[in-house]
Amino acid sequence: MLTFLIPTAKEMKPVPPCYPHQLPQKSLPILEAMAELSLEELARAYSISIEAASKEAKRLKAIAQGQSSAYPAYQLFNGLMYRHLKRDNLSKDQQDYLSKQVYITSSFYGIIPTDEKIAEHRHDFHTKVTINGQSLKHYWRPIYDQFAKDHKQIISLLSSEFKDVFSKEYQRLWISPKFMEERSGQLKTHSTISKKARGAFLTACLENNVQTKEALKQLSFAGFCYNEELSTETNYYYIKKES
């Protein structure tokens, strides 16, 4: 069975219904460390304005007091990749695929199933906070590595920010899809292309119930097709040709 890893997104959009929120035990030290920061320190930790930090302080306080609403993570995150992922009108099989084979890597919650109920928050691995003297990446690394050890065939749709939490010995075993567009005879890629294509790729996987590496190579989605020439054992290239 294939296991997919995807990143979080800064943009969030709460979609009813909401649920009671329960913070995982491993996340509590992070919440406590953030709660100790002054508004100015919080702004520096997030690299945001004081006004934006005030909003985040209220969110953190609500989480700490058990007053936050929670939403399925794949519905709450609303970045470009998530907007290009099929999230509504899923069949039971597609819903099972999304909830049992796709996991979200979070700097606040750890590695969670896509349907895990989470609260609105602003947090990533660039957040400047230490937990017991450790950076967020080092704090989560043992748990991330254990996940990689327990899941043999990982398909990584992670950016370097999230990928680098894992030890390199595990990263080397993954398959990492790469997405490029042909323009004026040249192959181009940038973050917008990649984010949109990740969502479309994952949609194709769940719609076709893809379970093997060979099946990944047969996929076509949003104009992208697998390219044998460029691909290696661990990097699968998907190219969108000029129309």
Curated annotation (Swiss-Prot):
GO terms for biological process: response to hydroperoxide. Transmembrane segments: none annotated. GO terms for cellular component: cytosol. InterPro entries: YaaA. NCBIfam families: PRK02101.1-4 (NF002543). Belongs to the UPF0246 family. PANTHER family: PEROXIDE STRESS RESISTANCE PROTEIN YAAA, PEROXIDE STRESS RESPONSE PROTEIN YAAA. This is UPF0246 protein Sez_1855. It comes from Streptococcus equi subsp. zooepidemicus (strain MGCS10565). The lineage of its organism: Bacteria, Bacillati, Bacillota, Bacilli, Lactobacillales.
